[in-house]
Amino acid sequence: MKQAFRVALGFLVLWASVLHAEVRIEITQGVDSARPIGVVPFKWMGPGTPPEEIGAIVGADLRNSGKFNPIDAARMPQQPSTAAEVTPAAWTALGIDAVVVGQVQPSADGSYVVSYQLVDTSGSAGSILAQNQYKVTKQWLRYSAHTVSDEVFEKLTGIKGAFRTRIAYVVKTNGGKFPHELRVSDYDGYNQFVVHRSPEPLMSPAWSPDGSKIAYVTFESGKSALVIQTLANGAIRQVASFPRHNGAPAFSPDGTKLAFALSKSGSLNLYVMDLASGQISQVTDGRSNNTEPSWFPDSQNLAYTSDQGGRPQVYKVNINGGVPQRITWEGSQNQNADVSPDGKFLVLVSSNGGAQHIAKQDLETGAVQVLTDTLLDETPSIAPNGTMVIYSSTQGLGSVLQLVSTDGRFKARLPATDGQVKFPAWSPYL
């Protein structure tokens, strides 16, 4: 746990201006059918009021996963703070088979000890399924709550939790000298900060696999350029600034390469840069437009969008050569694919009959499932555990971020109050 906090500390961007969070998750569908669970308000062991409501954060995380439906505190049959105080029968009467209890204890040195227990109320009634405690400073209390959520989620589902991840996105604010901002926040919209401000558009942020850098497109020089920015110190490395278009960056999962699209020779084509040497190799060629690369887990193959068949469709190609293989066949056009972390499926923007929605395609069976019913959906990005997708859609006259589970049952939005939000990118595990 101490190592996890040391790693997270490396992502504090001291040079960036911290903002009041402008996005918050608002659930729109699916929580009622999720598994009920009890997340009891954590007992505050100090004077006055607690600096953070840890239990509320854990409950929100589990609800936001789409897999759990924490009951309201008013419906709880009791509010224990330790496993020994839990009365299993009182919870099973409500259909609840697991309860999270915990405490927050202030320390003399100004830090806090957060402890929790996950209690089984049915199978082995009263037994402790998971427990832990963390000593943290005030600024890391939310992080400790997300850590509780990750551990509880993994214990109950067998899937690694992704509550300590972040999202990057571009905001076009309503005026000012620098109306275009690249921002990063916790996955739930809290702890938002500005990575870069620009008078010209910013596009297509992409995380490095260790979460320390973000590649993106900038037009500050009067034309498009690809850059990589280090979050810890703000250092910017220019990667590509060729004539015409430079866009769609994507780090390879092994962190050694960056794929992107260039139109320096006419049509858009895919290129890959070796990040250590700076050497660039061309992957696709021809007169068609090839763009929007997304890596497969082997760091050797790319899914990408091409109009070589007339309309945009998704193809797969090996970066070392070979004949591209078409992946998508349903719908009038498909684009903007993101390959899942395990390489078993992809999510993409699928257009059919004038509608433009996020869809999921199983790469083994080819089965396609439309996940969304929002308007003009764009740029899907999958969470590192493969359970959720964040994307942008049109709402009114602007654009907002939306969430959907990869089974399509859970939906939520992250409305912004100070501008249009586009190009979301979910971070790796941090």
UniProtKB/Swiss-Prot annotation:
Pfam families: PD40 (PF07676), TolB_N (PF04052). It is found in: Periplasm. Keywords: Cell cycle, Cell division, Periplasm, Signal. GO terms for cellular component: periplasmic space. The keyword Cell cycle applies. GO terms for biological process: cell division; protein import. Residues 1-21 form the signal peptide. Its main location: periplasm. The Tol-Pal system is composed of five core proteins: the inner membrane proteins TolA, TolQ and TolR, the periplasmic protein TolB and the outer membrane protein Pal. They form a network linking the inner and outer membranes and the peptidoglycan layer. NCBIfam families: propeller_TolB (TIGR02800). Belongs to the TolB family. This is Tol-Pal system protein TolB. It comes from Yersinia pestis. The lineage of its organism: Bacteria, Pseudomonadati, Pseudomonadota, Gammaproteobacteria, Enterobacterales.
